[in-house]
Amino acid sequence: MSDYKIWVDADACPNPIKEILFRAAERKALPLVLVANQMIRIPPSPYISQIRVGAGFDVADQYIVDHVEPTHLVITADIPLAALIIEKGALALNPRGELYTVDNIKQKLTMRDFMEDLRGSGVHTGGPDSFSQADKQAFANSLDKWLVRV
């Protein structure tokens, strides 16, 4: 069990997802590390910890990349971070329950870059849909699939 760990890119992670992760860490006695540039409220637990990094662009992301191992799972909505995690042989799951994979990450990066270019040229592209109960359930289901293998 000690080889497995869950990292959370916690600054933008929705609170309902953190709650699911807190329960999973306790249930499976699995290390859960939340990395953020601000203090994150966590329950008292020998399995749950947080790392507060300095302010700055992608500082939390770099911390996770520097410490992740192939048996780890990273929770992030940050597609470039997910790509780096996959390169290191670990798994990345977004808060809506979608697993980033070698097969889909390039397409996601391309779409992200395209949308960024559109926004940069003044086109209003809108944002993602509001986080929903269905997203929460999809995340819980995807996390459970990973936990079964642990």
Curated annotation (Swiss-Prot):
<dbReference type="InterPro" id="IPR003791">
    <property type="entry name" value="UPF0178"/>
</dbReference>
<dbReference type="Pfam" id="PF02639">
    <property type="entry name" value="DUF188"/>
</dbReference>
<protein>
    <recommendedName>
        <fullName>UPF0178 protein Sbal223_2514</fullName>
    </recommendedName>
</protein>
<comment type="similarity">
    <text>Belongs to the UPF0178 family.</text>
</comment>
